[in-house]
């Protein structure tokens, strides 16, 4: 059997205010083409199907279209909820969908969902384990010895009687190999704790011939090739730009996994990072429809910099400053300003914009305005 392993679609996601739905539909169309080209006999969706628990209607319509396209092709779908999804909403109409070959495990209610498919060698069991927390597993399995995430997942899997000699796990969790954590990305906005009670050791999956994981946005193996994160099909952050996104084609033979092959994806628009003086960046623009994250090296901030940048690159997403010769600044300025008093922040901003510090009179005026504003708040 050949199946495609996908994860972390994050349908409905916005990146720096940009709606990514058109890009997501483009990449889903490409995935359907890969299904046809490689003769995929199933598609696995390992969680974070949506970006939020209450996704926009257009995102729901897009998922409906994608699932319908797969069902029309008679390609079974095996999906679990992720930490971004509403498990209850994903479970809606799951019984009816199963009759069309779309198997969705939204909530964990005491045991993973087991689905058996067949190929010419016999049965293959897909064990669908949605995103779970230790407290949830403890609620449904009160007699199990659950002390952390690792033991919780172990207890959840232990209740499953193997339904076939060849077994595939579909899960959405933080999985580590011993003390080696996976490589994270900036687009993973949920707090991820690595190497502590919040992670699961890949050794828990020894009874499966392949573990199809979601949660981490960089495609990678965890310890061994058969325990794998598919990664997100699109780049959603600066630190992912330049990375080759893919879906994973897995071939299960008579005795287990025979081949694991990443199939490269080409986005509608790439995310690119440009660095240099503004005048140089906009002088000879190329690939102007790409999403641009710009770091300007001009000595002082320019008031209309973003407008000039978007005149050359309409999809410019973000702009940061790092004057030539200055120490590198974090891309996320939240960390840089956290804990600084208001007066210092305003002084820094004024100096950058005007090339001089505030005078004593101006400092007093700002302080007075701040006090008056605080009374209004």
Predicted regions and their residues:
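Conserved catalytic scaffold of divalent metal-dependent phosphoesterases
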Residues: 92-194, 233, 253
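Active-site neighborhood of phospho(di)ester-bond hydrolases with catalytic His/Asp-centered motifs
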Residues: 6-7, 43-48, 76-83, 103-108, ...
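N-terminal active-site segment of His-dependent metallophosphoesterases
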Residues: 1-68, 72, 363, 368-372, ...
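Active-site neighborhood of divalent metal-dependent phosphoester/pyrophosphate hydrolases
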Residues: 40-58, 74-88, 174-196
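Metal-dependent catalytic neighborhoods of phosphoester/phosphodiester hydrolases
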Residues: 14-16, 49-66, 81-101, 106, ...
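Accessory, non-catalytic peripheral segments of nucleic-acid enzymes
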Residues: 37, 42, 251-377
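Binuclear metal-dependent phosphoesterase catalytic core
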Residues: 112-125, 129, 227-290
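Conserved beta-sheet core of the metallophosphoesterase superfamily
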Residues: 177, 181-258
